[in-house]
A protein has these predicted regions:
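Domain-terminus/edge residues, biased toward the C-terminal soluble/receptor-binding domains
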Residues: 149-150, 164-166, 171, 176-414
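A generic structural signal for short, solvent-exposed coil/turn residues
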Residues: 17, 30-32, 74-76, 90, ...
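Generic detector of low-complexity/intrinsically disordered segments
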Residues: 7-11, 15, 162, 301-305
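Active-site-adjacent loops and short helices of periplasmic peptidoglycan-processing enzymes
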Residues: 23-191, 198
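Sec-dependent N-terminal signal peptides of Gram-positive bacterial secreted proteins and lipoproteins
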Residues: 2-25, 380-400
Length: 414
Protein backbone atom coordinates (compact mmCIF):
# COMPACT_ATOMS: atom_id res chain seq x y z
CA UNK A 1 0.00 0.00 0.00
CA UNK A 2 2.77 2.45 0.97
CA UNK A 3 4.58 1.57 -2.23
CA UNK A 4 1.50 2.38 -4.29
CA UNK A 5 1.03 5.73 -2.50
CA UNK A 6 4.70 6.61 -3.05
CA UNK A 7 4.44 5.75 -6.74
CA UNK A 8 1.33 7.89 -7.07
CA UNK A 9 3.02 10.86 -5.36
CA UNK A 10 6.05 10.58 -7.64
CA UNK A 11 3.79 10.46 -10.71
CA UNK A 12 1.68 13.39 -9.47
CA UNK A 13 4.68 15.59 -8.68
CA UNK A 14 6.29 14.75 -12.02
CA UNK A 15 3.06 15.69 -13.80
CA UNK A 16 2.85 19.01 -11.95
CA UNK A 17 6.51 19.79 -12.62
CA UNK A 18 6.28 19.03 -16.34
CA UNK A 19 3.14 21.09 -16.78
CA UNK A 20 4.57 23.95 -14.75
CA UNK A 21 7.66 23.94 -16.93
CA UNK A 22 5.48 23.94 -20.03
CA UNK A 23 3.43 26.87 -18.76
CA UNK A 24 6.53 28.85 -17.82
CA UNK A 25 8.30 28.09 -21.12
CA UNK A 26 7.61 31.43 -22.71
CA UNK A 27 9.52 34.59 -23.40
CA UNK A 28 9.75 36.88 -20.39
CA UNK A 29 7.60 39.97 -20.35
CA UNK A 30 9.59 43.02 -21.52
CA UNK A 31 10.47 45.57 -18.85
CA UNK A 32 8.65 48.86 -18.50
CA UNK A 33 10.62 52.05 -19.14
CA UNK A 34 9.88 55.61 -18.12
CA UNK A 35 11.04 57.28 -21.35
CA UNK A 36 8.35 58.38 -23.79
CA UNK A 37 10.16 56.73 -26.68
CA UNK A 38 12.21 53.54 -26.55
CA UNK A 39 13.53 50.76 -28.75
CA UNK A 40 15.61 47.59 -28.51
CA UNK A 41 17.08 46.59 -31.87
CA UNK A 42 19.33 43.79 -33.08
CA UNK A 43 22.29 45.46 -34.78
CA UNK A 44 22.89 42.63 -37.27
CA UNK A 45 19.40 42.21 -38.74
CA UNK A 46 17.68 45.41 -37.64
CA UNK A 47 14.91 43.37 -35.99
CA UNK A 48 13.03 45.28 -33.31
CA UNK A 49 12.67 43.33 -30.04
CA UNK A 50 10.99 46.07 -28.01
CA UNK A 51 9.28 49.29 -29.02
CA UNK A 52 7.52 52.26 -27.51
CA UNK A 53 6.58 55.26 -29.66
CA UNK A 54 9.58 54.47 -31.86
CA UNK A 55 8.56 56.81 -34.70
CA UNK A 56 7.45 59.80 -32.65
CA UNK A 57 9.91 62.72 -32.93
CA UNK A 58 11.43 64.14 -29.75
CA UNK A 59 14.30 66.55 -29.02
CA UNK A 60 17.32 64.22 -28.57
CA UNK A 61 19.69 66.53 -26.65
CA UNK A 62 23.31 65.33 -26.74
CA UNK A 63 22.53 61.92 -28.23
CA UNK A 64 22.71 64.03 -31.40
CA UNK A 65 26.48 63.77 -31.03
CA UNK A 66 26.59 60.18 -32.28
CA UNK A 67 25.75 61.56 -35.74
CA UNK A 68 28.48 64.20 -35.36
CA UNK A 69 30.89 61.41 -34.38
CA UNK A 70 29.84 59.31 -37.38
CA UNK A 71 30.40 62.13 -39.86
CA UNK A 72 33.75 62.93 -38.26
CA UNK A 73 34.93 59.33 -38.59
CA UNK A 74 33.70 59.21 -42.19
CA UNK A 75 35.30 62.50 -43.26
CA UNK A 76 38.44 62.95 -41.14
CA UNK A 77 41.59 61.24 -39.97
CA UNK A 78 42.12 61.18 -36.22
CA UNK A 79 45.43 63.02 -36.56
CA UNK A 80 44.01 65.83 -38.69
CA UNK A 81 44.51 69.27 -37.16
CA UNK A 82 41.53 71.53 -36.48
CA UNK A 83 41.90 75.29 -36.09
CA UNK A 84 39.06 76.59 -33.93
CA UNK A 85 36.98 79.43 -35.39
CA UNK A 86 35.15 82.31 -33.70
CA UNK A 87 31.82 80.62 -32.96
CA UNK A 88 32.65 77.28 -31.23
CA UNK A 89 34.09 78.90 -28.04
CA UNK A 90 30.74 80.69 -27.61
CA UNK A 91 28.71 77.46 -27.45
CA UNK A 92 26.40 77.12 -24.44
CA UNK A 93 26.20 74.22 -22.02
CA UNK A 94 28.79 71.51 -21.49
CA UNK A 95 32.20 72.44 -22.93
CA UNK A 96 35.97 72.05 -22.57
CA UNK A 97 36.58 75.79 -23.13
CA UNK A 98 38.45 75.81 -26.41
CA UNK A 99 39.76 79.11 -27.80
CA UNK A 100 39.57 80.85 -31.14
CA UNK A 101 42.68 79.98 -33.13
CA UNK A 102 43.47 76.95 -30.97
CA UNK A 103 44.87 73.96 -32.84
CA UNK A 104 43.55 70.56 -31.75
CA UNK A 105 43.60 67.10 -33.27
CA UNK A 106 40.37 65.53 -34.46
CA UNK A 107 41.02 62.69 -32.00
CA UNK A 108 41.08 65.07 -29.03
CA UNK A 109 37.84 66.74 -30.12
CA UNK A 110 36.17 63.34 -30.52
CA UNK A 111 37.17 62.35 -26.99
CA UNK A 112 35.76 65.66 -25.75
CA UNK A 113 32.60 65.10 -27.78
CA UNK A 114 31.88 61.58 -26.54
CA UNK A 115 33.27 61.63 -22.99
CA UNK A 116 32.56 65.19 -21.80
CA UNK A 117 29.71 65.83 -24.26
CA UNK A 118 31.44 69.09 -25.18
CA UNK A 119 29.23 71.37 -27.27
CA UNK A 120 32.16 73.55 -28.30
CA UNK A 121 34.02 70.48 -29.59
CA UNK A 122 30.95 69.49 -31.63
CA UNK A 123 30.83 72.90 -33.30
CA UNK A 124 34.57 72.92 -33.99
CA UNK A 125 34.30 69.54 -35.74
CA UNK A 126 31.25 70.70 -37.70
CA UNK A 127 33.02 73.80 -39.00
CA UNK A 128 36.14 71.78 -39.81
CA UNK A 129 34.13 69.33 -41.94
CA UNK A 130 31.55 71.59 -43.61
CA UNK A 131 32.68 75.16 -43.04
CA UNK A 132 29.60 76.18 -41.07
CA UNK A 133 27.01 74.81 -38.65
CA UNK A 134 24.28 75.28 -41.27
CA UNK A 135 26.07 73.25 -43.94
CA UNK A 136 27.02 70.57 -41.43
CA UNK A 137 23.36 70.26 -40.40
CA UNK A 138 22.48 69.64 -44.05
CA UNK A 139 25.13 66.92 -44.16
CA UNK A 140 23.69 65.38 -40.97
CA UNK A 141 20.21 65.23 -42.48
CA UNK A 142 21.48 63.84 -45.77
CA UNK A 143 23.37 61.07 -43.98
CA UNK A 144 20.36 60.34 -41.77
CA UNK A 145 18.20 59.72 -44.84
CA UNK A 146 20.86 57.44 -46.31
CA UNK A 147 20.71 55.35 -43.12
CA UNK A 148 16.93 55.01 -43.40
CA UNK A 149 15.94 57.67 -40.87
CA UNK A 150 12.47 58.97 -41.73
CA UNK A 151 11.56 61.34 -38.90
CA UNK A 152 14.79 63.21 -38.22
CA UNK A 153 15.72 66.87 -38.63
CA UNK A 154 19.00 68.15 -37.21
CA UNK A 155 19.77 71.88 -36.98
CA UNK A 156 23.00 71.71 -34.95
CA UNK A 157 25.81 69.22 -34.20
CA UNK A 158 25.47 69.12 -30.41
CA UNK A 159 21.78 68.76 -29.57
CA UNK A 160 21.26 72.10 -27.84
CA UNK A 161 17.51 72.62 -27.77
CA UNK A 162 15.84 73.97 -30.89
CA UNK A 163 12.16 73.71 -31.73
CA UNK A 164 12.93 72.05 -35.08
CA UNK A 165 15.72 69.76 -33.86
CA UNK A 166 14.02 66.35 -33.65
CA UNK A 167 14.59 62.63 -34.09
CA UNK A 168 13.05 59.33 -32.97
CA UNK A 169 14.08 56.27 -31.01
CA UNK A 170 14.23 54.18 -34.18
CA UNK A 171 16.26 56.75 -36.11
CA UNK A 172 18.76 57.07 -33.26
CA UNK A 173 19.11 53.27 -33.24
CA UNK A 174 19.90 53.30 -36.97
CA UNK A 175 22.58 55.96 -36.47
CA UNK A 176 24.04 54.03 -33.52
CA UNK A 177 24.01 50.85 -35.59
CA UNK A 178 26.24 52.57 -38.15
CA UNK A 179 28.67 54.45 -35.90
CA UNK A 180 29.22 51.49 -33.56
CA UNK A 181 30.79 49.58 -36.45
CA UNK A 182 33.81 51.88 -36.24
CA UNK A 183 36.59 50.51 -34.03
CA UNK A 184 37.76 54.06 -33.23
CA UNK A 185 34.29 54.96 -32.00
CA UNK A 186 34.13 51.89 -29.74
CA UNK A 187 37.61 52.59 -28.37
CA UNK A 188 36.87 56.23 -27.58
CA UNK A 189 33.39 55.55 -26.24
CA UNK A 190 34.73 52.91 -23.82
CA UNK A 191 37.59 55.02 -22.50
CA UNK A 192 37.02 56.01 -18.87
CA UNK A 193 39.46 58.93 -18.67
CA UNK A 194 41.49 60.88 -21.21
CA UNK A 195 43.75 63.92 -21.16
CA UNK A 196 44.08 66.50 -23.92
CA UNK A 197 47.66 67.70 -23.96
CA UNK A 198 48.58 71.42 -23.83
CA UNK A 199 48.06 73.32 -27.09
CA UNK A 200 49.08 76.63 -28.61
CA UNK A 201 46.29 78.31 -26.60
CA UNK A 202 46.15 76.22 -23.43
CA UNK A 203 49.16 75.55 -21.21
CA UNK A 204 47.37 72.98 -19.05
CA UNK A 205 46.15 69.48 -19.77
CA UNK A 206 42.40 69.03 -20.05
CA UNK A 207 41.19 65.92 -18.17
CA UNK A 208 38.05 64.21 -19.51
CA UNK A 209 35.76 61.68 -17.79
CA UNK A 210 33.29 59.30 -19.36
CA UNK A 211 29.68 59.92 -18.25
CA UNK A 212 28.43 56.52 -19.43
CA UNK A 213 27.96 54.40 -16.30
CA UNK A 214 27.50 51.18 -18.26
CA UNK A 215 31.24 51.12 -19.02
CA UNK A 216 32.36 52.05 -15.49
CA UNK A 217 33.27 48.85 -13.64
CA UNK A 218 32.69 50.40 -10.22
CA UNK A 219 29.15 51.45 -11.15
CA UNK A 220 26.09 49.41 -10.19
CA UNK A 221 24.96 49.87 -13.80
CA UNK A 222 28.13 48.39 -15.29
CA UNK A 223 27.19 46.14 -18.20
CA UNK A 224 29.77 43.69 -19.46
CA UNK A 225 29.91 43.85 -23.24
CA UNK A 226 28.86 47.49 -23.51
CA UNK A 227 30.75 48.94 -26.46
CA UNK A 228 29.48 52.51 -26.57
CA UNK A 229 26.83 54.87 -25.31
CA UNK A 230 25.84 58.52 -25.20
CA UNK A 231 23.75 60.43 -22.69
CA UNK A 232 21.79 63.59 -23.37
CA UNK A 233 19.95 66.20 -21.31
CA UNK A 234 18.51 69.67 -21.53
CA UNK A 235 15.61 71.08 -19.53
CA UNK A 236 13.32 71.11 -22.56
CA UNK A 237 14.59 67.86 -24.12
CA UNK A 238 14.67 65.90 -20.84
CA UNK A 239 16.89 62.81 -20.57
CA UNK A 240 17.92 60.63 -23.51
CA UNK A 241 20.33 57.73 -23.81
CA UNK A 242 21.60 55.45 -26.58
CA UNK A 243 23.78 52.39 -25.96
CA UNK A 244 25.08 49.27 -27.70
CA UNK A 245 26.32 46.01 -26.20
CA UNK A 246 27.21 42.57 -27.43
CA UNK A 247 27.53 38.99 -26.28
CA UNK A 248 29.60 37.19 -28.86
CA UNK A 249 28.23 38.05 -32.30
CA UNK A 250 24.86 39.07 -30.85
CA UNK A 251 24.79 42.86 -30.61
CA UNK A 252 21.88 44.94 -29.30
CA UNK A 253 21.12 48.65 -29.40
CA UNK A 254 18.88 50.31 -26.82
CA UNK A 255 17.52 53.84 -27.09
CA UNK A 256 15.57 55.85 -24.53
CA UNK A 257 14.40 59.32 -25.50
CA UNK A 258 12.48 62.12 -23.75
CA UNK A 259 12.61 60.72 -20.23
CA UNK A 260 11.42 62.98 -17.40
CA UNK A 261 12.97 60.62 -14.84
CA UNK A 262 16.66 59.89 -14.55
CA UNK A 263 16.22 56.12 -14.83
CA UNK A 264 17.75 55.62 -18.27
CA UNK A 265 20.79 53.67 -17.04
CA UNK A 266 18.63 51.20 -15.11
CA UNK A 267 16.04 50.94 -17.88
CA UNK A 268 18.67 50.35 -20.55
CA UNK A 269 20.28 47.56 -18.52
CA UNK A 270 16.87 45.94 -18.12
CA UNK A 271 16.20 46.21 -21.85
CA UNK A 272 19.57 44.71 -22.77
CA UNK A 273 19.14 41.84 -20.31
CA UNK A 274 15.65 41.20 -21.68
CA UNK A 275 17.06 40.96 -25.19
CA UNK A 276 20.05 38.77 -24.41
CA UNK A 277 18.10 36.47 -22.07
CA UNK A 278 15.16 35.81 -24.38
CA UNK A 279 16.48 35.96 -27.93
CA UNK A 280 19.37 34.55 -29.89
CA UNK A 281 21.11 35.35 -33.15
CA UNK A 282 21.28 32.45 -35.59
CA UNK A 283 23.75 32.41 -38.46
CA UNK A 284 21.98 30.37 -41.10
CA UNK A 285 24.43 30.73 -43.99
CA UNK A 286 27.88 32.17 -44.61
CA UNK A 287 28.76 34.00 -47.80
CA UNK A 288 29.62 31.42 -50.47
CA UNK A 289 27.69 28.52 -48.90
CA UNK A 290 25.79 26.25 -51.28
CA UNK A 291 22.15 26.75 -50.28
CA UNK A 292 20.40 24.42 -52.72
CA UNK A 293 20.49 23.13 -56.29
CA UNK A 294 18.53 24.41 -59.25
CA UNK A 295 17.46 21.69 -61.69
CA UNK A 296 15.09 22.61 -64.48
CA UNK A 297 15.06 20.89 -67.88
CA UNK A 298 18.56 21.35 -69.34
CA UNK A 299 19.90 23.68 -66.65
CA UNK A 300 21.51 22.47 -63.44
CA UNK A 301 23.55 24.64 -61.07
CA UNK A 302 24.25 25.41 -57.41
CA UNK A 303 22.59 28.39 -55.74
CA UNK A 304 25.06 30.24 -53.52
CA UNK A 305 24.45 32.59 -50.56
CA UNK A 306 25.49 36.10 -51.66
CA UNK A 307 26.12 37.25 -48.08
CA UNK A 308 26.13 35.99 -44.52
CA UNK A 309 22.53 35.49 -43.42
CA UNK A 310 21.37 35.89 -39.82
CA UNK A 311 18.01 35.87 -38.14
CA UNK A 312 16.68 36.38 -34.63
CA UNK A 313 14.53 33.86 -32.81
CA UNK A 314 13.15 33.44 -29.33
CA UNK A 315 15.27 31.03 -27.31
CA UNK A 316 12.27 28.93 -26.35
CA UNK A 317 11.17 28.57 -29.97
CA UNK A 318 12.28 25.10 -31.16
CA UNK A 319 11.43 25.77 -34.80
CA UNK A 320 14.04 26.02 -37.51
CA UNK A 321 14.03 28.31 -40.50
CA UNK A 322 12.90 27.03 -43.90
CA UNK A 323 13.35 28.50 -47.38
CA UNK A 324 10.57 29.57 -49.72
CA UNK A 325 12.42 29.80 -53.04
CA UNK A 326 11.32 32.28 -55.68
CA UNK A 327 9.81 30.55 -58.73
CA UNK A 328 11.68 31.68 -61.80
CA UNK A 329 12.73 30.10 -65.10
CA UNK A 330 16.48 30.63 -65.36
CA UNK A 331 16.76 28.93 -68.76
CA UNK A 332 15.56 32.05 -70.52
CA UNK A 333 18.09 34.50 -69.04
CA UNK A 334 21.84 34.97 -69.26
CA UNK A 335 23.94 35.52 -66.13
CA UNK A 336 27.48 35.31 -64.85
CA UNK A 337 28.96 33.51 -61.89
CA UNK A 338 28.26 35.57 -58.76
CA UNK A 339 25.24 37.43 -60.17
CA UNK A 340 22.14 37.54 -57.97
CA UNK A 341 19.62 35.43 -59.87
CA UNK A 342 17.06 34.36 -57.25
CA UNK A 343 15.93 35.17 -53.73
CA UNK A 344 14.35 33.09 -51.02
CA UNK A 345 12.08 34.10 -48.18
CA UNK A 346 13.28 32.64 -44.87
CA UNK A 347 10.39 31.48 -42.70
CA UNK A 348 10.12 30.00 -39.23
CA UNK A 349 8.23 26.80 -39.91
CA UNK A 350 5.96 26.91 -36.87
CA UNK A 351 4.14 30.11 -37.82
CA UNK A 352 5.47 31.10 -41.27
CA UNK A 353 7.02 34.18 -39.69
CA UNK A 354 9.16 35.85 -42.36
CA UNK A 355 12.56 36.59 -40.84
CA UNK A 356 14.32 37.89 -43.93
CA UNK A 357 15.23 37.54 -47.59
CA UNK A 358 18.25 35.54 -48.76
CA UNK A 359 19.85 36.60 -52.06
CA UNK A 360 21.17 33.73 -54.15
CA UNK A 361 23.80 33.70 -56.91
CA UNK A 362 24.98 31.15 -59.45
CA UNK A 363 28.17 29.11 -59.21
CA UNK A 364 28.75 29.37 -62.97
CA UNK A 365 27.98 31.35 -66.11
CA UNK A 366 24.90 30.70 -68.23
CA UNK A 367 24.30 32.05 -71.74
CA UNK A 368 20.99 31.82 -73.55
CA UNK A 369 21.41 30.70 -77.18
CA UNK A 370 19.42 29.25 -80.00
CA UNK A 371 21.66 26.24 -79.57
CA UNK A 372 20.58 25.81 -75.96
CA UNK A 373 17.09 24.43 -76.39
CA UNK A 374 15.12 21.52 -75.17
CA UNK A 375 14.93 18.40 -77.36
CA UNK A 376 11.62 19.30 -79.00
CA UNK A 377 12.77 22.80 -79.99
CA UNK A 378 16.08 21.44 -81.23
CA UNK A 379 14.23 19.04 -83.58
CA UNK A 380 12.07 21.86 -84.93
CA UNK A 381 15.07 24.09 -85.48
CA UNK A 382 16.99 21.29 -87.19
CA UNK A 383 14.07 20.54 -89.52
CA UNK A 384 13.72 24.20 -90.49
CA UNK A 385 17.47 24.43 -91.05
CA UNK A 386 17.45 21.37 -93.35
CA UNK A 387 14.50 22.72 -95.36
CA UNK A 388 16.17 26.09 -95.87
CA UNK A 389 19.45 24.38 -96.75
CA UNK A 390 17.74 22.23 -99.42
CA UNK A 391 15.97 25.27 -100.86
CA UNK A 392 19.28 27.11 -100.94
CA UNK A 393 21.06 24.21 -102.68
CA UNK A 394 18.27 23.78 -105.25
CA UNK A 395 18.42 27.50 -106.01
CA UNK A 396 22.17 27.31 -106.57
CA UNK A 397 21.83 24.27 -108.86
CA UNK A 398 19.14 26.00 -110.91
CA UNK A 399 21.20 29.17 -111.11
CA UNK A 400 24.24 27.24 -112.36
CA UNK A 401 22.18 25.39 -115.00
CA UNK A 402 20.71 28.65 -116.20
CA UNK A 403 24.15 30.24 -116.33
CA UNK A 404 25.51 27.26 -118.28
CA UNK A 405 22.73 27.51 -120.88
CA UNK A 406 23.44 31.20 -121.39
CA UNK A 407 27.12 30.50 -121.98
CA UNK A 408 26.26 27.84 -124.54
CA UNK A 409 23.89 30.18 -126.35
CA UNK A 410 26.56 32.89 -126.54
CA UNK A 411 29.11 30.41 -127.88
CA UNK A 412 26.71 29.26 -130.58
CA UNK A 413 25.97 32.88 -131.57
CA UNK A 414 29.64 33.74 -132.16
Amino acid sequence: MKKNILSFLIFFLSFVFINSATINAKTSKPPSVSADGAILMDAQTGKILYEKNINKPYPPASTTKIMTALLTLENCNLDDEVTVGKKPPLADGSKIFIHEGEKLKVKDLLYALLLESANDAAEALAEHISGSIEDFSKLMNKRAKELGCTNTNFVNPNGLYHAKHRTTAQDLALIMKEVSQYEDYRKISNTITYKIKPTNKSKKERPLWNKNKLVQQNSKYYFKGCNGGKTGYTTQSQHSYVVSANRGDFKLIAVLIHDSKKTFFEDSVNLLNYGFNNFELIKMYSRGDIVTEYNEKDLSLNLIARDDFYYIKEKINPSKAILNLEKKNLNSISFHKGDTILNAQVLLNNNNNNVGTLNLSSDRNHETSIFKMNSENKLIFFTIFVVFFLIFMISIIRFRKKLKRKKQQRKYFY
